[in-house]
Amino acid sequence: MNITSITFNNFRCFGEYHLQFKPTVNLLFGVNGCGKTSILRGLKIAMSSFFSGFSDSNTRFIGISNDDFMSEVHDGVESLERQVIISYDFAEFQNMILSRTGKKNRTAISGIKPLRDYTHSLYHDLSTEDDGSIALPLFAAFSTEDIHSSRKLDRSIFCKYYQPRSFGYYECLQGDGFFDYWMHRLLILQEGQKSLSEIEVVQCAIGAALGDSGCNIIRNVSIRPLQKTVYFHFVDGREIDSRNLSDGYKRLVNIV
């Protein structure tokens, strides 16, 4: 689900703004106040259209909010609301359009019907005949506040041994403040000896991204329920628990 281009009309600080994306890594450069955060916000809205059809309690379609309307003041008088339009192309779906005419209206999704129909069908297949072979796209968003954010969530959600695959999308585009919750889940699974394949996936991902074949920083993860601690084994021999990881390493682990 690579996004190839996006155009904003009357979105936040942009009257009209168009961006093309390369298929690999894209970097945004700009001075303070030029709209980088607004662009990222718009991209989250566009990417979340996947969840307009692939929808359950673990997913969330963000939509265009009241704060996304352009606000202009002339001689102390605020201008009338202008329709917000976000048009974008995925590699597989072109000319997708989300719009909202006013703050009293909801986000119109008629312009993403092909995508919505596809994702609804994908969710149906996943719910009825999934044997683990159905490939799902990856969505994730992280900000500079990720590990420092404090969120009050129901921990019981992370304590359920068996979760549907959609649980991997839980707040995936609003994921700040989740590090401690995911560490807690690893401890719960290890203690109950349940869903051990989920732990194995995490360990393999850490090893592949941060281990010998990756960044060569962290080689392995050990989960010790009796100590209520998750330890990270560094390639230099150090063993550090999750609470004492430096901000930089904690961010790396959180992203993986």
Q: What do these predicted ranges mean?
A:
Residues 1-178, 194-198, 208-214:
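P-loop NTPase switch/coupling surface
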Residues 44, 254-255:
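Active-site-flanking alpha-helical
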Residues 167-254:
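Extended helical coiled-coil dimerization/tether regions that scaffold
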